[in-house]
């Protein structure tokens, strides 16, 4: 019987919070807004990103949205970012526990595949589902397409992510969810979602294995 883990990429397997804030601040300053701290970012960041950018002082009526997104993604490529040290051990542990694994991300498909290939992670995943845009839209739709690809399941897959949006996506898809508190949103924000909260990726896999065992799988 297949048991599936659905991994988020940015902020979950990839430790890119610092890079995201640095790129965001460059984009903000270019448009006359004030830079923010990592702590402020983790307190306020959310999906969709348009309201978040407006909250930070970006005049969305003045600035072209596609240019905003292109600036951010251009800037973030210039910032240091790396997969979490626990990412490979967590993926290996999940595979050893009998899980099949896939990725669902709000990152554009080509950038997602490039990132996974660079990390040497593609071999862990049966499916890799990113989006077709730069503003993080349509992750939910891609999740629905992924669920269709997985077919009829005897137990819901478990989505591991780092944002309240991941929790929302999981609920819509009928998946279970485990949130990790080391990513783009603070743990106290994630706790409000009502899903199990892990401190790191290893604990997330352990929670997933325990949940699967309770189902007798």
Question: Which residues are covered by each model-predicted region?
Answer:
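Active-site neighborhood of HAD-like aspartate-dependent phosphohydrolases
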Residues: 1-43, 55
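Conserved Lys-Pro-Asp/Glu-containing loop-to-beta segment of HAD-superfamily phosphomonoesterases
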Residues: 4, 139-168
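Conserved phosphate-coupling serine/threonine residues in phosphotransfer and NTP-handling enzymes
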Residues: 12, 105-107
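A metal-dependent, Asp-based hydrolase signature
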Residues: 30, 43-75, 85-96
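Conserved H-loop
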Residues: 34, 122-126, 153
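A short, structured active-site edge motif that brings together acidic residues
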Residues: 40, 122-137
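Short, acidic loop-to-helix structural element flanking the phosphoryl-transfer center
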Residues: 76-103, 110-113, 140
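Acidic, Mg2+-coordinating phosphoryl-transfer loop and its flanking beta/alpha structural elements
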Residues: 158-197
